[in-house]
């Protein structure tokens, strides 16, 4: 005999979700570009450089983040602990195959504290995090971690940790005042037909680009926007490793 229920739950169909396409100039489908420009509600981020990159831009409405000119408004996009931890993981990736990644986890902690401290200052930019970590004495870190600074082993440990934090930060540029600050949050709050361009210098490591993409994914998730990675062969590279 079947079970009779006094009422039934009926799930409403989920509304269609907008889509964020992250592409390079040569992998961006023309029909996707046309649809976004016409205001279909989807969004586009283009990562690249050169003539094909600039030819896609509408100078009157599109936005650009150029790591070489330091105009990413990082702290506007990282107001929560989750967002900051996501950025830290992007700057200091950890390969699960690493047999001893303890110094990398320590480096993540140092970077997280630096971001938290610098973010309390008005008008803070990523260059402030770079400078703070660059000027942090190894013996101070060793002492904070509980090492005896008289022991050279503790100081060497701190030097190793700091090197792992400084490496992804050393190419962070000072903000060029001629370049308006650009925020992912503000871009997403604006018209969907506005495209975000991210300049990629082939001579620079992709650490900051990784953090930008991580932030794009996070804010897309919060906005219930599906993300489609369409970079093709133009994958982001960190220290020679494709990710």
Feature-to-residue mapping (PLM):
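P-loop NTPase motor domains
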Residues: 2, 13-15, 21-23, 28-242
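Short hydrophobic short-linear motifs embedded
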Residues: 1, 5-7
